[in-house]
């Protein structure tokens, strides 16, 4: 009789060529007075154009059996009586995308710098603050504001693909456009900036790619989850919209599989001979991903034969089961 034993075959020694898209959480929209849109989360990728006009970054070369950090940044908060907050950073191994800057709020208040900069708040008198900067190769600056007692218009939040629009007389600035990516096999635009509020007239629209719209009468629209879109500005003391959460997308060859720690929310898909993992939430900043692979094997499994009968008219024992195949997944 043979006892069954567990066994393990380690992955190959060669490095794993890995594409990535890492987007941080978007900044919250302003919500006191003269409110501006939040900036989009920072946008870094090896599979196409990065944010802020940056080129594609180098692919990562990773190893089997090593735990790599993965974190999805939350969107920035917003309220009706305070300036919003910046979005949180997203991380994959050595790649960190910076959270989007909060939109300005109250008289002449500047937006925050971030992955993309928040828009500048307006005022009845004075001059507009300088535009809040985005992070190089991640996102663009927010827009400036138009000053006027009953004609003000705040600045839109910057997007990964374009600056936030400046406010104009009774017109809130639009959020900057996001950037399209085909890393999952289809084109999706993410990381648009949040639209701004205005005294009357026309609020700023959210930038393409999940930016929230501003308002001239009510609350701002939140940035879309898992796009890193900036939050739209609220009117007067109405709350601005929260920033959209970020996302981390990992693309590896079809023979490589990812194993995530328990606090990771992830979906998987395949496209063009690759396995694609879209991480949409992490419960802590200590979550990890480890890579394994399929090991090609040829196998033959034969069971023991049955014993023959031991009395009159007895029959012979049956042969054991027989199975063979290849490409066993480990």
Which residues make up each language-model segment?
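Low-complexity, glycine/proline-biased repetitive segments and flexible coils/loops
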Residues: 1-330
């Amino acid at each position: 009789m043979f006892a069954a034993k567990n066994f393990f075959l380690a992955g190959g020694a060669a490095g794993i060529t890995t594409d990535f898209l890492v987007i941080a959480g978007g900044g919250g929209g302003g919500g006191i007075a003269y409110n501006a849109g939040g900036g989009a989360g920072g946008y870094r990728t090896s599979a196409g154009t990065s944010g802020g006009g940056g080129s594609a970054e180098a692919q990562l070369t990773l190893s089997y059996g090593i735990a790599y950090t993965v974190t999805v940044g939350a969107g920035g908060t917003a309220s009706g009586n305070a300036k919003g907050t910046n979005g949180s950073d997203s991380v994959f191994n050595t790649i960190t995308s910076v959270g989007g800057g909060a939109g300005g709020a109250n008289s002449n208040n500047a937006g925050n710098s971030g992955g993309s900069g928040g828009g500048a708040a307006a005022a009845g008198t004075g001059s507009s603050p300088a535009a809040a900067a985005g992070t190089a190769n991640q996102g663009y600056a927010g827009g400036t504001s138009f000053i006027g007692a009953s004609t003000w218009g705040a600045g839109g939040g910057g997007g990964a693909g374009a600056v936030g629009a400046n406010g104009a007389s009774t017109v809130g600035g639009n959020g900057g456009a996001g950037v399209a990516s085909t890393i999952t096999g289809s084109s999706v635009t993410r990381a648009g900036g949040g639209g701004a509020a205005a005294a009357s007239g026309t609020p700023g629209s959210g930038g393409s790619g999940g930016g929230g719209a501003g308002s001239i009468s009510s609350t701002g629209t939140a940035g879309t989850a898992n796009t890193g879109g900036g939050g739209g500005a609220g009117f007067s003391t109405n709350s601005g919209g929260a920033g959209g959460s970020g996302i981390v997308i990992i693309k590896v060859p079809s023979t490589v599989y990812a194993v995530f720690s328990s606090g990771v929310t992830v979906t998987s898909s395949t496209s063009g001979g690759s396995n694609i993992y879209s991480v949409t939430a992490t419960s802590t900043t200590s979550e990890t991903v480890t890579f394994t692979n399929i090991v090609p094997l040829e196998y033959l499994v034969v069971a023991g034969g049955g014993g023959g009968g031991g009395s009159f008219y007895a029959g012979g024992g049956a042969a054991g089961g027989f199975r063979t195949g290849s490409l066993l997944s480990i």
